[in-house]
């Protein structure tokens, strides 16, 4: 797949996740980031909006008390508590599915991302 298309999908996904409008942890409304629950290296869920969390930069990266990157075990526990076990199981099942994308699928993904309700 071509890099410009990947970048376009990444931007569409991040913008959709940030439409939530505030940090899902501390409720700040500035310096928002889109965080992947499952790594972006797992393409089957890389652009799934439910795989994203809207976090302020502190909760995403910098805080030593709660940070998706500095305290990942606590983040996973918090995410499951926030979104529920059904969300977690459905996303995990999708992550473990064997899907191979072709270039035409990526164009459809942008439409799917844009239609998601946050």
Predicted segments with their positions:
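Short linker/helix segments within small regulatory modules
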Residues: 38-53
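Short histidine/acidic/glycine/proline-rich micro-motifs that form metal-
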Residues: 39, 62-66, 96-97
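Short flanking/linker segments adjacent to small metal-binding domains or redox-active Cys/His motifs
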Residues: 87-118
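Short Cys/His-centered divalent metal-binding micro-motifs
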Residues: 31, 52-84
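Active-site metal-coordination segments of metallo-dependent hydrolases
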Residues: 7-8, 43-47, 64, 68
């Amino acid at each position: 797949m071509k890099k410009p298309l990947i970048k376009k999908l990444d931007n569409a996904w991040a913008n959709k996740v940030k439409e939530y409008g505030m940090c899902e942890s501390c409720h700040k409304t500035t310096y928002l980031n889109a965080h992947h629950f499952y790594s972006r290296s797992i393409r089957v869920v890389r652009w799934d909006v439910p795989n994203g969390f809207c976090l302020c930069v502190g909760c995403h990266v910098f805080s030593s008390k709660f940070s998706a990157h500095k305290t990942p075990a606590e983040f996973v526990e918090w995410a499951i508590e926030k979104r529920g076990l059904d969300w977690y199981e459905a996303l995990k099942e999708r992550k473990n599915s064997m899907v191979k994308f072709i270039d035409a699928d990526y164009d459809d993904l942008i439409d799917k991302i844009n239609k998601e309700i946050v």
